A protein has these predicted regions:
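Polybasic, low-complexity binding patches
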Residues: 2-4, 40-52, 59-92
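Short cysteine-rich loop/turn motifs with clustered Cys
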Residues: 5-32, 54-56
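Short recognition patches in nucleic-acid-associated and regulatory proteins
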Residues: 30-40
């Protein structure tokens, strides 16, 4: 799931901020940008609403069942972890 509405510069800045790794599982492979609050629910392209996820965590975040990850986080748990990660990143 690629967010075509993000500029290359914004995408690069988020990857850099997150250390070029998935913010949840620490994988450096298959990275994608995820909107913590979906745009369809009023979320924006503000960096505080964006997080780097690997393709597996991103798929799970959007409700795709991954057989090899059955004991991994649920979409709700991923959403909560994303909120916590971004909040910690921007805490004063």
């Amino acid at each position: 799931m690629i967010s075509a509405n993000l500029t290359k510069n914004v995408r690069r800045a988020i990857y850099k901020r997150d250390g070029y790794r998935c913010a949840l599982c620490d994988s450096p492979k298959g990275l994608q940008i995820h909107h913590v609050m979906p745009r369809s629910e009023g979320g924006s392209n503000d960096p505080m609403n964006l997080i780097t996820l690997c393709w597996v965590c991103h798929a799970i975040a959007h409700g795709t069942r991954m057989p090899d990850c059955a004991d991994w986080m649920t979409p709700v748990e991923i959403h909560e972890a994303c909120i916590e990660y971004v909040a910690d990143m921007y805490a004063p």
